Amino acid sequence: MKKFALLPISLFTALAITACGDSESGNPVTPESSDQPSISSEALPGSSAALPASSTSVPGSSETVPPASSATVPNSSATVVTPVEFTTEAVVVPDMGCTTEPLTVASGVKVTCDGQFAGNVQDDEDTTPFDPNAAAYISFVGIQKIYESLEATDKVVFLLRHAHRTASTDSTGVLTGKGYIQADRVGQHIAGTEEIKYWHSEISRTLQTCMAIAQGRGQTEISHVALKDLNGGWFEKDHAKIEEYYANEPTSYDVVSRWAYNDYLDPATTYNDGYYDLMERGAQFMNDIVLAKIAPQSRISIVVSHDQMLYPLTIFATNRALEMKHHEDKSWLNFLAGVAVIIKADGTVKYVPVKGLDEGTMSS
């Protein structure tokens, strides 16, 4: 039996933000309930300002394939690297009173915290080979496969949802003991001595996830930075309008799902007044944030955000071909899943749905 005993921590408490799941327009976020789960309070909404013009051309309609395998890094990121002030500190993860023991029927561990069964953490056991030269991937690929497929001249940005959290979906929600172990095991799958830069939102559970991944990799120090653009509301244009849409669907997850897949019961009814265009806004994030800001800082980057942002971004990255339609089958983005952005030496870019655990989706 392995004891998951780690160092005590105070910085997460200091980083935790006062509950502020409000949109910047001042409209309160609908709290999550057992009758109507809400993803709107999973993270801090981003800016509700008008969609700024991208520095590169972006797809103009929902039918346009995202620049997955033919896109190139924007000129600005290829010629000028804007300095980023990272915080470098010791890797510190709290002792959650958890122990682990190997599973007997699958690869992974059984987690017990404070004497109570906390769940199983299963590893990816899909033996299908990953072909980095395939034209497109529309299903989730294990993070270890992608990491091990990288050539020395490749860069990769792993965009991941945080690990398992407490019930609170607002800024007070933190990782559970199971969540720390999930993230630690993801780190073990990409262990190595090469430096990784970590990016996270302003909400503490994303930094906690980064810390645990770094620990799993064998790091004693971590270089990280908080980025407001990762707070969760990147795709939201008018949060108050989005809240009005909740009356149309069984859950708020279904609102996001129908908008992201452009799949409505009544074609005359859309949610476009509340959300930006998926393809335009997704391409803008990839071009202006991932390729121009994050990727130039290190060969390998870990970016931890929230499902409110990464669910639609993953759908964008597969041109809506990924099967994750909550409004049909209740499937949702799993913890530690998202998108791997692989950048070749010649500037071509490939998007691959990535999973850190055994499955890329979960039922919500």
Roles of regions detected by a PLM:
Residues 350-364:
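Low-complexity, Gly/Ser/Thr/Pro-rich intrinsically disordered linker/tail segments
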